[in-house]
């Protein structure tokens, strides 16, 4: 069909865009972090205007409704513990037109490439192609921001916003398609919760991803082949735990004491062991 021919004709343009956009996000990583910082400042001001006491769930989105109008901005949506039932959510917007120049250029190229197809390929078809790229672009931005925001506390990025002890920041267009950027759960848990969650992880592979363990003692376990990306142990004691072939990419251990532990065969890319103390802990293998 004409639409299939058009898709094939523009496939190289789309591939070039993905490469260009990926490079652009990396090049402008600091600017994307600045977008988050600016949005938090605006959200704090809006919370004060609305008399909003705190937020728990924070969502960044590049909305399709904005993209259709080439209105390149991100929405930051803040809700309290009521989540969807929050009767007074707060929202603010930050312009990102310059950061999304590659997307705008792709749009122009797709329109130009449509010459000769007549009514067989319409504006709706072009928009659908662009919408497919939004999800890929969201993922690129998330990959960069996860690491840019790791030192959020030292940088004071979220200071303007009053948050609950548990709060989470996500990025994506729809709430069920979002990715976590930051999650904090500064609530001390009963020791049994750790064991329960590990047991659940055997059936739910991503159960421990982004999990947060605060001021606890976690001891005497052998954990094999588990997905524990971006897990955090804060001001805790991790004792006699063998992490074997686990994925601990982006994990954090601020103020934590590790005693008699080993990380044989683990993926520790981007792991943060600053401000830790170690006793008889091995990273061999």
Stretches found by the model and what they are:
Residues 9-54:
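Short N-terminal edge-element motif at the start of the domain
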Residues 3-4, 8, 12-20, 108, ...:
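Compositionally biased, non-globular sequence tracts
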Residues 188-285:
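Tandem repeat scaffolds
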Residues 59-61, 75-100, 161:
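Amphipathic alpha-helical protein-interaction segments
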Residues 132-226, 231:
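Acidic, proline/glycine-rich low-complexity IDRs
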Residues 40-79, 166-167, 171-184, 222:
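Amphipathic, interaction-prone secondary-structure segments
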Residues 23, 27-30, 128-140:
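Generic amphipathic alpha-helical segments used as scaffolds and interaction surfaces in large
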Residues 85-125:
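Compact, glycine/acidic-enriched structural inserts
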């Amino acid at each position: 069909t004409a639409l299939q021919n058009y898709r094939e004709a523009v496939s190289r343009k789309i591939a070039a865009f993905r490469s260009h956009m990926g490079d652009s996000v990396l090049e402008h990583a600091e600017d994307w972090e600045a977008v988050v910082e600016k949005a938090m400042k605006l959200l704090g001001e809006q919370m004060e205007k609305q008399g909003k006491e705190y937020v728990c769930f924070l969502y960044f989105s590049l909305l399709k409704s904005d993209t259709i109008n080439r209105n390149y901005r991100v929405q930051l949506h803040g809700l309290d513990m009521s989540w969807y039932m929050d009767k007074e959510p707060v929202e603010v917007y930050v312009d990102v037109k310059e950061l999304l120049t590659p997307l705008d250029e792709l749009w122009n190229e797709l329109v130009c490439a449509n010459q000769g197809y007549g009514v067989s390929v319409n504006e709706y078809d072009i928009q659908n192609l662009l919408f497919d790229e939004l999800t890929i672009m969201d993922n690129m931005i998330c990959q960069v921001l996860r690491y840019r925001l790791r030192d959020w506390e030292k940088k004071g990025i979220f200071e303007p916003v009053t948050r609950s002890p548990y709060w989470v920041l996500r990025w994506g267009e729809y709430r069920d398609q979002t990715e976590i950027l930051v999650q904090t759960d500064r609530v001390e848990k009963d020791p049994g919760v750790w064991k329960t969650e590990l047991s659940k992880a055997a059936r739910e592979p991503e159960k421990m991803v982004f999990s947060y363990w605060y001021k606890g003692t976690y001891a005497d376990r052998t954990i094999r082949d588990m997905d524990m990306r971006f897990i955090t142990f804060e001001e805790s004691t991790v004792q006699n735990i063998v992490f074997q072939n686990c994925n601990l990419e982006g994990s954090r251990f601020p103020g934590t004491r590790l005693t008699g532990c080993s990380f044989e065969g683990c993926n520790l890319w981007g792991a943060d062991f600053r401000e830790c103390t170690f006793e008889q802990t091995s990273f061999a293998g």
